[in-house]
Amino acid sequence: LKPISLFIIVFILSSSFVFSEEKNPIQLYQEIALSKKLDLNRYWRLLLHYRDPIFFGKSKSEADGNEFFLSPNGKTDPKAELLETISSFFREPLPEEIEETKLHPFCKYPERFRWLDSQLNFDRGLLPKLNCERYKNWIEALNPTSIKLIFASFYLNNPASLFGHNLLKIGSGESSKSEILDYAVNFAANNSPDDSALVYTIKGVMGGYPGVFSIFPYYYKINEYNDMESRDLWEYELNFDEEQSKRITAHIWELGSTHFDYFFFDENCSYQLLSLLEIGNPELKLRDRFNLYTIPSDTVKLILEQEGLVRKKSYRPSLSSKMNQKLFYLEKEERHRVSQYLKGKLELKDLLEFQDPQRQAYMLDAILDANRYQKSLKNYTPQEEQKYRNVLVERSKIDFPPLVEQKPMVSPPENGHGSGRVKISRGESTLGGYSEFAIRAAYHDFLNNDKGYVPFSAIEYFPIVIRKYDFQNNPMVEEFSFFKILSLSPVTSISTPISFFVDLGADSSAIKRDFSFQKTLPYLLAFESEIQPWLIQPAYQKAKNDYEKTYRITNFNSDATGGFTFSNVNSGNSLLWTLSFQLGGKARGNGYYQEGMLVAPQAAIFTGCSYGNWKFGISAQYFVFSIYGYYKDDYKVSPGIRFSPSQNSEIRLEGKLQKYYEEAQLSISLFF
């Protein structure tokens, strides 16, 4: 019996050992995934939007919605999310997941599944039997075969669009369908429509809004950007095949379940769309180029730098660009007659008198575009609607095709200078010689080359100017702005837009102690204290106590003006000019005013002209501080001339005239 008993014991033990070695298939898939280090694979990290810290610490996903992660630690643990994702695909579906009122992970994450299946070769017999009808219907409706990056030009009346905007267009494979019926992918802050521009800007900078992906018919965006906001669209067809396009589209479906904290400067529309392009081609490392801020026009330049990435470029002019193009091709007398008709000073029959059919067609087409543009700005009255219909009827009688689309009258964004700038200057002033260093995070000022930008505009964020006079031991802040915006939209026969200028930050002025009192507010103690920070100490002409002489101080500064502009920027001429008259207010604060801060009326003129790589400009502001009775008015006149040797460099000769102070300087700027 002993040999038999020993055999039975050995058999039982060996059987137990064999059965203990048999593993759940899910565990096997997980082990294979870890052995392949899929949690470290770039594509997995792209799908979950993981980013490594700049210095040290764990990887962290930029997705901020908890519902995007299947593991409780998924936001910071790629391995845990990988294991939980594999396990979830094999989970039995809940009743609501079968009905698809809620999505099973198998249907919720189609691109995660596709990629993991390509790496692990899942057994289809072990997977739940789900049709994923919602996803199938969605992807079939989009039918992705190509991808375009879209750049919508700058819109100065909206803080979200000061730098332009990026979106993607998913091309459909249906040749019979118009391209405008394709779908566009947008990433934007989900803000309240009741938020003011100031609230939007502050919360946008601080990441106070959730950013979400959304999909619209492309014609909807064309209507919004091209027609309602008169923004040109530049389309860049990317060299992605159908399989790559479908990968991107499948991942967009996955992102519908989450949000990203929206940051105005970095994690914005451009940045998040670049992450989608990396899904299409993981070898592209586009986001690595942007650490501090991401700007839509810089995104366009970046994709054009990637060899072979852009297949074709096309231009979709805005309603105002179409109108200006048609007006440009009219004769001078024809333009005058069109203007008179639009002002109600000429009847339609008189407009067309003595004109051949071709010229009549061109004039009527210009009027129709002008009418559409006017309708985008205001609601037409019944009388105006009737006049519009009369023009349509008259145009239908002329059997002559519209003017063939001409060369764009504006430059594409890639032709513009870099958004960042460093500037080195040397100058002479009332206080003697000085050296100056300036740096600007973004974007464009009045004297910069306008190629790729709104002509004669300024959009600046965080420009700072540090100056050291030769007699000083330490430098001081000459100027600083949180933001500075100058919008000079010209008055035309079609519309009368308001031009405006806003600036918030610090500037410098010259002061003489010609009044007897002084008062320092608590927040301005640094200006008076003996231990004041060297960056904001005044620049005296001689000794500190010599109040009879001119000295220069750094002030808190705020400007806001509005008015009207006259210009020929839409004429198509080589020599362009602008002239703007504005009225508004000026706030200036420092420790030498009795009130601490003065608020006074101001009048301003902005004018300039450009030709080729040359530009001349003058801004003149007059501040009526005399309303307080014991202060003198001040003024600031800033002439300048600029030459651009190349796209990303410029040389300037600038001056400044203020009360008690004058200066002139020569500078060299480099853009990046």
Describe each model-derived feature in a short phrase:
Residues 54-143:
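Low-complexity, highly charged intrinsically disordered N-terminal segments
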Residues 143-230, 439, 448, 468-480, ...:
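Glycine-rich catalytic cores of cysteine/serine-nucleophile enzymes that process amide/ester linkages
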Residues 218-294, 588-591, 654-655:
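Active-site nucleophile-His-acid catalytic modules used for acyl/amide transfer and hydrolysis
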Residues 266, 270, 315-458:
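Outer-membrane beta-barrel initiation region
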Residues 422-428, 441, 462-468, 498-508, ...:
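Transmembrane beta-barrel strands of outer-membrane/channel proteins
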Residues 426-435, 467-477, 508-514, 550-557, ...:
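Solvent-exposed loop/turn segments connecting transmembrane beta-strands
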Residues 439, 661-672:
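Outer-membrane beta-barrel "beta-signal"
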Residues 446-452, 459, 487-495, 534-540, ...:
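Repeated loop/turn-to-beta-strand initiation elements of outer-membrane beta-barrel proteins
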